[in-house]
Amino acid sequence: MTPPTRQPPIINAPWPVAGFALVLVVAHLLISLLPTRLQNAVFYFGALFPERFWSSSEAPSLAGLPPYSNAFEAFLPMVASAFIHADWMHVILNAAFLVALAKPLLELMRTIWPGREPGASVLLLALFLFAQVASSLTFLALSFPDGGPAVGASGGISGLLAAVLLIREGPGRWLLSQRFLVASSLFVIANAVFAFIGPSLLGANIAWQAHLGGYVGGALSMRMVLWRMQLRRA
């Protein structure tokens, strides 16, 4: 009698990576099930609104949106926007890229912090969130004073991409290595192309500013991780 074959997991990734990807999908599902009024509230408080960020009571936005009332309300969308997506294609693409990029990163971080789970997972999450905040700040800065709103985890995922590309250079190489600069240039060119063709091809604007900011944030934070790896091996 042949033993039963084990079915492969739906998401072939370590559970922290699979769990984070599922959080993105479940968050979108829950938001989509809310009444329209509550969906609008989630978008209002969780999306990045350059108009709200840059306006004030003395200089109101052109659209009439009120400015953020305090620092926490202004900072919240820099993280919360990662868990809000425009549609199902948006969230599924981001979840797929998250799994593809976070899996090798988590494996590397487990070699830096062996036997100290959830330390490696927390480090990976911190890298993602740092890149997401960097992407949000870049988007707000380059959308001054009244750009359109932005949502999605692509800024943090761009940071994971930079981290993966930097891994290929090894812990002893820096951000100005030739291969990393070439890969980064291709990333910038790809975003420039999608910024022009995105509205006609995808029916939506591409937040290229967020992608570039997240990429730089991910590269800088990953450089710190690789520096820590060098110290452990010394």
Language model: regions and residue ranges:
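A detector for small-residue-rich transmembrane helices and their helix-helix packing motifs
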Residues: 1-234
